[in-house]
Curated annotation (Swiss-Prot):
Homodimer. Identified in NR3C1/GCR steroid receptor-chaperone complexes formed at least by NR3C1, HSP90AA1 and a variety of proteins containing TPR repeats such as FKBP4, FKBP5, PPID, PPP5C or STIP1. Forms a complex containing HSP90AA1, TSC1 and TSC2; TSC1 is required to recruit TCS2 to the complex. The closed form interacts (via the middle domain and TPR repeat-binding motif) with co-chaperone TSC1 (via C-terminus). Interacts with TOM34. Interacts with TERT; the interaction, together with PTGES3, is required for correct assembly and stabilization of the TERT holoenzyme complex. It comes from the Eukaryota. Residues 225-279, 700-733 are annotated as: Disordered. It comes from Bos taurus. Residues 285-621 are annotated as: Interaction with FNIP2 and TSC1. It is an enzyme of class 3 (hydrolase). This is Heat shock protein HSP 90-alpha. ISGylated. S-nitrosylated; negatively regulates the ATPase activity and the activation of eNOS by HSP90AA1.
Length: 733
C-alpha cells in the first residue's frame, strides 16, 4: 500500500497539494450518507467493484482499436486488500484510470444529474442500495469509511492522489508513491465500528451476493498464518535474528547460549534423532483467492453448457433446493443486444400472489454489472414466477427506475422475454408429464395472463388445460375439445363452479350431456376472470351454460316441439313472474333441463352465480358495484317435469289458489341453491323444508311440540289438493 503523502518530508511537494470544495449538492449528499443510519451498508463494496468494472470495460473497449493502450498493464482484474492493522480496505483495478481533471470533476466539483434526484428519493424513503442507479455510487464509500484516498493513473497523465474526510472539501496532489502502471486504487479508512468489512468471510459473502458475475477476476488478498515445521537449528537462527534487532541484548551474551543449545542438541540427538524436527513456528503469508470463478453462464454458448451447470447456477441464483423444471437460454442481437437465461421452478412459492412480494424475480445486469432484481418493467406480473437473469449491452449503467419506465430498450427486452417464456411453455407442453407438474403449480399465472395480456391471449389460451364432461381424470386443451366437437356444434360450452363434482352434477349440463355435447369444467375462481376476456378460441365462441340464451344444436322437429311447449306454459310463466315479482327478471321455458324441474340462469353480461359468490367473499368489495353487476336472475322451468306440469294444471284450474304462491317460492329458492346462489333469507326457506319433513313424518298440526304456524303448511302440498284449509301456507309470508 502506498504511503499517504510524502509532502511532510518534502516541503516542495506540499505546495502541490490543492484543496477543492465539494459542489453543494454533493456535500449535501455526503452529509446525508454519513449522518443517517442505513442497515445495508454493505452495498458500498458492490458500487466500488461496479465502478472498477466500468473502468476495465472502458480500457478494454479502447484497446480494441488501439492495442497499445494495454502496454501499461495487460491484465484486467480487480483486487480487494483488507488490512486489519491499518483498518483499511483497498479496492484496486487495472482499468482506464483518471486524469487530474477527471479526479476533480468526477469526484467532487461537478454534480451528476442523478445527485439531486437520489437525495430526493432517499428523503422520500428510498433504499440506499439504489445509489448506483443515480450515478453517485462512489460516495457510498462514506457509509463505512471516515476517510477515502483514491490513487489513480491514466495513460495520458501522471499518477494522482485524491483524499477527503467528507468535511466539505477534498485534496488532490501528485502521487509519488509506488507506481501503478494504470488503474485506480481506492483506500477506505474504515470507521471504528465498521471493521466487519475487513473479515474474509464478510467480504466473500458480499461479493457472492452482489458481484459474483462481474466479467473480470476479483481477487481477495488476505494475510494468514500457518504452522511451519523446522529443525531446532533453523528455529534458533530465526530467534537469533529477532534478538539481534533488540539493542538491549549484547552479541557476547548470545554466543554461549548458542553453544549450550548446540551441545544439548548433540546429546539429545543421541537419544532421539528426530527431536529437532518437531519444533513448529508461525509463518505469515498472503493468501490470494479469486472470488468470482463462476463466469457469467449466460455469456457462454448454450450448446457448451450441461444440465448440471444450469442446475448449479439455478440453485445459486434462487437458493432453491430442487432442480428447475425448464430452462430457456438465448441471446438477441442486431439493433438491440442482450442475453437472457430464464428458469421455470418446480413449484410455486407459497406467497406467489401476495401484494408485498416482488413483482418479478429476474435479475437485471448491464454489461455483467448487476443493476437490480425487482425491475417491474422487465416482465409482466403474471410471469412473476420466472427466475433468471437478463444482461443488456445497451442500457446505461446508471439507469434509474424513472428512466426504466420510459426506456424503449426495456420495452423491447420485455416483449422478447414474454415471447421466449411462451415458447418455453409451449415446448414444455409437448412433455405431458412435465407439463402436468407445471400446470398444477402455475395455471393461475397462465389464466391471469389471459385476463391481462391481450397481445398474447391467443398463445396463452393454447396452454390452458381443463377437465370436461368427456375427459375423465385427464385435463385437455381447448384444441383437443375442438377436435371432438359435433358436426353441427357452433360453440364451446363451459360451466364455472367450485368443484368438479358440483359442476358435473349441475342441472345446467343435463341436456348437453344427454346429447353428447362436451362441457368444459372451470373450477378455479380465476377462471371467471379468464373467460371474461377469452371470448373465443379458433373461431368458436365460448358460451356459459349457466347464462340465458343457450343455443343447442337441434333439428327442425325439435325446434317445433320447443315452440309448442313455450305456448303451453306461457300462462304459468306469467303467473310465476307475478308471484316472484322483482326476484327474477323473467320466467321462461328451458331447453337445457332434463331431470331438474327448474334452474336459475343469469343475463348474458351479468355475473354468474359463481362470480357473485367470489365477489361477495372480497373483504374490500364495493357494494355499489355489487348492486348493478350482481346477476340478473332468470327462472327457467322444465316443461317435461311432473312438478311443473302439475303446477301448471293447478294454476290453470284455479288462478286464485294460494298454495301455488308457496310452491312457486319454494321452487325458486331451491333452484337458487342448486344453481349456486345463496339465499337472502335462509331461515324462511328452512321453515318451509321443516314443514315438509313434518308432513313426511305424519306429525299432526295439533301436536303440542309443533308450531301452530308451521304445522299446517304441509296440507297445501300438491298431494293434499283436496284439503279445505288452502290458505294456511300464506302465513309463512
Amino acid at each position: 500500500m502506498p504511503e499517504e503523502t510524502q509532502a511532510q518530508d518534502q516541503p516542495m511537494e506540499e505546495e502541490e497539494v490543492e484543496t477543492f470544495a465539494f459542489q453543494a449538492e454533493i456535500a449535501q449528499l455526503m452529509s446525508l450518507i454519513i449522518n443517517t443510519f442505513y442497515s445495508n451498508k454493505e452495498i458500498f463494496l458492490r458500487e466500488l467493484i461496479s465502478n472498477s468494472s466500468d473502468a476495465l470495460d472502458k480500457i478494454r473497449y479502447e484497446s480494441l482499436t488501439d492495442p497499445s493502450k494495454l502496454d501499461s498493464g495487460k491484465e484486467l482484474h480487480i483486487n480487494l486488500i483488507p488490512n486489519k492493522q491499518d483498518r483499511t480496505l483497498t479496492i484496486v483495478d487495472t482499468g482506464i484510470g483518471m486524469t487530474k481533471a477527471d479526479l476533480i470533476n468526477n469526484l467532487g466539483t461537478i454534480a451528476k444529474s442523478g445527485t439531486k434526484a437520489f437525495m430526493e428519493a432517499l428523503q422520500a424513503g428510498a433504499d440506499i442500495s439504489m445509489i448506483g442507479q443515480f450515478g453517485v455510487g462512489f460516495y457510498s464509500a462514506y457509509l463505512v469509511a471516515e476517510k477515502v484516498t483514491v490513487i489513480t493513473k491514466h495513460n495520458d497523465d501522471e499518477q494522482y492522489a485524491w483524499e477527503s474526510s467528507a468535511g466539505g472539501s477534498f485534496t488532490v496532489r501528485t502521487d509519488t508513491g509506488e507506481p501503478m502502471g494504470r488503474g485506480t486504487k481506492v483506500i477506505l479508512h474504515l470507521k471504528e465500528d465498521q471493521t466487519e468489512y475487513l473479515e474474509e468471510r464478510r467480504i466473500k459473502e458480499i461479493v457472492k451476493k452482489h458481484s459474483q458475475f462481474i466479467g473480470y477476476p476479483i481477487t481477495l488478498f488476505v494475510e494468514k498464518e500457518r504452522d511451519k515445521e523446522v529443525s531446532d537449528d533453523e528455529a534458533e537462527e530465526k530467534e537469533d535474528k529477532e534478538e539481534e534487532k533488540e539493542k538491549e541484548e549484547k552479541e557476547s551474551d548470545d554466543k554461549p547460549e548458542i553453544e549450550d543449545v548446540g551441545s544439548d542438541e548433540e546429546e539429545e540427538e543421541k537419544k532421539d534423532g528426530d527431536k529437532k524436527k518437531k519444533k513448529k513456528i508461525k509463518e505469515k503469508y498472503i493468501d490470494q483467492e479469486e472470488l468470482n470463478k463462476t463466469k457469467p453462464i449466460w455469456t457462454r454458448n448454450p450448446d457448451d453448457i450441461t444440465n448440471e451447470e444450469y442446475g448449479e447456477f439455478y440453485k445459486s441464483l434462487t437458493n432453491d433446493w430442487e432442480d428447475h423444471l425448464a430452462v430457456k437460454h438465448f441471446s438477441v442481437e442486431g439493433q438491440l443486444e442482450f442475453r437472457a437465461l430464464l428458469f421455470v421452478p418446480r413449484r410455486a412459492p407459497f406467497d406467489l400472489f401476495e401484494n408485498r412480494k416482488k413483482k418479478n424475480n429476474i435479475k437485471l445486469y448491464v454489461r455483467r454489472v448487476f443493476i437490480m432484481d425487482n425491475c417491474e418493467e422487465l416482465i409482466p406480473e403474471y410471469l412473476n414466477f420466472i427466475r433468471g437473469v437478463v444482461d443488456s449491452e445497451d442500457l446505461p449503467l446508471n439507469i434509474s427506475r424513472e428512466m426504466l419506465q420510459q426506456s424503449k430498450i426495456l420495452k423491447v427486452i420485455r416483449k422478447n422475454l414474454v415471447k421466449k417464456c411462451l415458447e418455453l411453455f409451449t415446448e414444455l407442453a409437448e412433455d405431458k408429464e412435465n407439463y402436468k407438474k407445471f400446470y398444477e403449480q402455475f395455471s393461475k399465472n397462465i389464466k391471469l395472463g389471459i385476463h391481462e395480456d391481450s397481445q398474447n391471449r391467443k398463445k396463452l389460451s393454447e396452454l390452458l388445460r381443463y377437465y370436461t364432461s368427456a375427459s375423465g381424470d385427464e385435463m385437455v386443451s381447448l384444441k383437443d375439445y375442438c377436435t371432438r366437437m359435433k358436426e353441427n356444434q357452433k360453440h364451446i360450452y363451459y360451466i364455472t363452479g367450485e368443484t368438479k363434482d358440483q359442476v358435473a352434477n349441475s342441472a345446467f349440463v343435463e341436456r348437453l350431456r344427454k346429447h353428447g355435447l362436451e362441457v368444459i369444467y372451470m373450477i378455479e375462481p380465476i377462471d371467471e376472470y379468464c373467460v371474461q376476456q377469452l371470448k373465443e378460441f379458433e373461431g368458436k365462441t365460448l358460451v356459459s351454460v349457466t347464462k340465458e340464451g343457450l343455443e343447442l344444436p337441434e333439428d327442425e322437429e325439435e325446434k317445433k316441439k320447443q315452440e309448442e311447449k313455450k305456448t303451453k306454459f306461457e300462462n304459468l310463466c306469467k303467473i310465476m313472474k307475478d308471484i316472484l315479482e322483482k326476484k327474477v327478471e323473467k320466467v321462461v321455458v328451458s331447453n337445457r333441463l332434463v331431470t331438474s324441474p327448474c334452474c336459475i340462469v343469469t343475463s348474458t353480461y351479468g355475473w354468474t352465480a359463481n362470480m357473485e359468490r367470489i365477489m361477495k367473499a372480497q373483504a374490500l368489495r364495493d357494494n355499489s358495484t355489487m348492486g348493478y353487476m350482481a346477476a340478473k336472475k332468470h327462472l327457467e322451468i322444465n316443461p317435461d317435469h311432473s312438478i311443473i306440469e302439475t303446477l301448471r294444471q293447478k294454476a290453470e284450474a284455479d288462478k286464485n289458489d294460494k298454495s301455488v304462491k308457496d310452491l312457486v317460492i319454494l321452487l325458486y329458492e331451491t333452484a337458487l341453491l342448486s344453481s349456486g346462489f345463496s339465499l337472502e333469507d335462509p331461515q324462511t326457506h328452512a321453515n318451509r323444508i321443516y314443514r315438509m319433513i313434518k308432513l313426511g313424518l305424519g306429525i299432526d298440526e295439533d301436536d303440542p311440540t309443533a308450531d301452530d304456524s308451521s304445522a299446517a303448511v304441509t296440507e297445501e302440498m300438491p298431494p293434499l289438493e283436496g284439503d279445505d284449509d288452502t290458505s294456511r301456507m300464506e302465513e309463512v309470508d
